[in-house]
């Protein structure tokens, strides 16, 4: 899959670039986040996410309708939208946020 970031902070975390200020997430969360992005890059299509039961892939509701999420850990979820690349018919994942799901 093709990955695009709408969130510059998360893109810097993924690329291992320095971020200014106090870190928003601890080391364990950032490492799991990177692993999830690598997983998203390596899947063939969105339907493959359903094969990973531990990710708890789901569409979001309410004010976040149109977004999807997968689990980073019990506290954090990776929120993203899914678009289509009309030329190759590959899904394009646009990373929106890394949220504290229960706050």
Report each predicted region and the residues it spans.
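A short, surface-exposed loop/turn module that caps and links secondary-structure elements
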Residues: 44-68
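Glycine-rich, flexible loop/turn motifs
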Residues: 1, 45-48, 56, 94, ...
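Arg/Lys-rich, positively charged N-terminal/basic patches that mediate binding to nucleic acids
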Residues: 1-37
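Short, surface-exposed helix-loop/turn micro-motifs enriched in polar/charged residues
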Residues: 2, 25, 49-52, 90
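Enriched for short, Lys/Arg-rich terminal
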Residues: 67-103
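Conserved phosphate-interacting/catalytic interface
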Residues: 40
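Amphipathic alpha-helical interface surfaces
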Residues: 6, 29, 33-36, 56, ...
């Amino acid at each position: 899959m093709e990955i695009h970031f709408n969130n510059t902070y998360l893109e810097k975390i993924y690329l291992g670039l320095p971020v200014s200020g106090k870190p928003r997430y601890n080391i364990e969360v950032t490492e799991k986040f990177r692993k999830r992005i690598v997983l998203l890059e390596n899947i063939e299509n969105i339907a493959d996410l359903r094969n990973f039961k531990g990710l708890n892939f789901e569409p979001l509701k309410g004010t976040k309708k149109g977004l999807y999420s997968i689990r980073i850990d019990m506290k954090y979820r990776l929120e993203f939208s899914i678009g289509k690349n009309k030329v190759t018919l590959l899904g394009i994942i646009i990373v929106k946020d890394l949220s504290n799901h229960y706050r």
